[in-house]
């Protein structure tokens, strides 16, 4: 389920009072998330990767993207109060609650797709987005990270955006189509090796759904051969849709099995 974008939850200063710490044991879908994570732990005997919605994307959902950007430009005090309340009253307590329930979880991953180019620009990222993720890391621990910003292919110098990505996800660099297809996997590999971090590349969902199996296999091969050089590489398939031909998924998996083996020696 998604929010009703025609009727945002936050319309005025008075609405900010609605943002209070929930009862995670009973309110909304919080108990369901805990139950699903518990079932995962019982099934595989290991704590799951914990997930949360990052401050900017949450603010955009409950305020509306256009309104939020206008707030940043014309009503910064209102925008700051919105971000502060969401971060301090909802997101931080939720992460700490999850950590208490799943103390052996090694990763706490924030989803923040709306904090991507060209939806936002570099100054907004630097002033309004990164500081709140860093606050989460400071209070909730270094296991917190936000990996899924996209849009570096919009820039003449993609590395300017990759640098910002590593500030909120310092252990690995993630890129996905269509960015990787546009600027090439070698750009990501070079930047990851320069900064001594692992690399994660994603094959786009649209590409998987609309391409022929041979094209899928070729892209998987290319990303593995370039991204996997010297190791420290992971490939994933982005949000496979129900319309994706089964033969394309099989082609991707077969290509991974064929090319995704590190040479030992």
Question: Which role does the model predict for each range below?
Answer:
Residues 2, 22-265:
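Active-site loop segments of alpha/beta catalytic cores
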Residues 1-22:
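A contiguous, low-structure linker/loop signature
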């Amino acid at each position: 389920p998604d929010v009703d974008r025609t009727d945002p939850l936050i319309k005025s200063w008075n609405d900010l009072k609605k943002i209070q710490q929930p009862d995670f044991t009973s309110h909304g879908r919080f108990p369901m998330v805990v139950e699903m994570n518990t079932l995962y732990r019982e099934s595989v005997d290991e704590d799951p990767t914990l997930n949360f919605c990052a401050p900017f994307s949450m603010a955009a959902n409950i305020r509306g993207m256009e309104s939020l950007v206008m707030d940043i430009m014309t009503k910064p005090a209102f925008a700051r109060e919105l971000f502060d309340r969401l971060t301090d009253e909802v997101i931080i307590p939720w992460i700490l609650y999850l950590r208490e329930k799943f103390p052996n979880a090694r990763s706490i991953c924030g989803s923040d797709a709306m904090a991507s180019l060209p939806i936002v620009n570099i100054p907004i990222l630097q002033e309004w987005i990164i500081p709140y993720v860093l606050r989460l890391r400071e209070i909730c621990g270094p296991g917190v990270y936000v990996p899924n910003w996209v849009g570096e292919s919009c820039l003449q110098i993609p590395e300017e955006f990759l640098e910002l990505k590593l500030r909120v996800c310092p252990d690995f660099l993630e890129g996905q189509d269509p960015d990787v297809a546009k600027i090439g996997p070698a750009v990501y590999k070079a930047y990851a090796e320069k900064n001594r971090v692992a690399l994660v590349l994603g094959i786009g969902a649209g590409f998987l759904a609309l391409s022929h199996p041979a094209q899928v296999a070729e892209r998987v091969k290319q990303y593995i051969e370039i991204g996997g050089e010297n190791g420290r590489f992971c490939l994933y398939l982005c949000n496979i849709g129900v319309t994706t031909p089964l033969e394309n998924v099989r082609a991707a998996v077969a290509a991974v099995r064929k090319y995704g083996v590190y040479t030992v020696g």
